[in-house]
């Protein structure tokens, strides 16, 4: 089964899609594709067949998203917690991943046609070496495509992602690339696996479970959360439309909350900068200075220096992460 299913919407689906596109269309949707095992039990087939049908549904859902103008999709494919399942099920899931990432390498023409960039987010060092290699090749093969993006969260949990981002910032301080005062929510956001993506507009979980299961906890603080009872392999175009309509009904409130949060984050950073400038002036014996121009000059210099350090650190971090892909490329050459 292909990663991208070709084909047009039906006449009725196109009619409804045009109505939906008259309102605010989400740029980025995240899916917790839950219900594969229950689907297998319901249909009296092997669990592995349930997971295979789940992948097939992903390919179909990506086609719907493309037709609706949704250009970024993130899916929860394999949690670190999944390693605790039975050996046979874990082995089956990893074998399915091997098969699908190998298949992806055979679909270069289709991926290029649609401009699909594949990103795999997670602690990939937890995976078998041969699967790491297949994933690295898939990322490398599509990294220059930029029409639409598929983020596959594999060997992932949000807590692990956040802890890793904190370790990266600590590494930056240890290396002298950052000052401890440079550490902030904004910088942590840029150290996440998902740092190249906007936060999801909608998070959809199927199967009726009403929990996030350690998925994108940081990124979905201002997302529309949609919990649907349908099992993932039975997901339909109409289920997707229902979720988008729910997002559209709440779009104004969500956007207002995002804007307020962004302003609050800027305000807190300005307060920290002003406190740092005051401390500098006190150390220099200028605490009584009422020179507003001096304070503005110091404030501008402080923020400029911080931005230079942060950008230097982020470039070093990007290079460090890219080295993993480069090593696999060298190994296979």
Curated annotation (Swiss-Prot):
Chief localisation class: endoplasmic reticulum
Record: residues binding (2E,6E)-farnesyl diphosphate: 34-35, 37-38, 85
Pathway the protein contributes to: Protein modification; protein glycosylation; Lipid metabolism
Function: With NUS1, forms the dehydrodolichyl diphosphate synthase (DDS) complex, an essential component of the dolichol monophosphate (Dol-P) biosynthetic machinery. Both subunits contribute to enzymatic activity, i.e. condensation of multiple copies of isopentenyl pyrophosphate (IPP) to farnesyl pyrophosphate (FPP) to produce dehydrodolichyl diphosphate (Dedol-PP), a precursor of dolichol phosphate which is utilized as a sugar carrier in protein glycosylation in the endoplasmic reticulum (ER). Synthesizes long-chain polyprenols, mostly of C95 and C100 chain length.
Knockout or disruption consequences: Embryonic lethality. Conditional deletion in retinal pigment epithelium causes deficits in the retinal pigment epithelium and the photoreceptors, leading to retinal degeneration. Conditional deletion in rod photoreceptor cells causes retinal degeneration.
One Gene Ontology cellular component: dehydrodolichyl diphosphate synthase complex
Keyword Methyltransferase set for record: no
Protein name: Dehydrodolichyl diphosphate synthase complex subunit Dhdds
Annotated GO MF terms: ditrans,polycis-polyprenyl diphosphate synthase [(2E,6E)-farnesyl diphosphate specific] activity; metal ion binding
Domain-level remarks: The catalytic site at NUS1-DHDDS interface accomodates both the allylic and the homoallylic IPP substrates to the S1 and S2 pockets respectively. The beta-phosphate groups of IPP substrates form hydrogen bonds with the RXG motif of NUS1 and four conserved residues of DHDDS (Arg-85, Arg-205, Arg-211 and Ser-213), while the allylic isopentenyl group is pointed toward the hydrophobic tunnel of the S1 pocket where the product elongation occurs.
Broad EC category: transferase
UniProt xrefs under InterPro entries: UPP_synth-like, UPP_synth-like_CS, UPP_synth-like_sf
PANTHER family: DEHYDRODOLICHYL DIPHOSPHATE SYNTHASE COMPLEX SUBUNIT DHDDS, DEHYDRODOLICHYL DIPHOSPHATE SYNTHASE FAMILY MEMBER
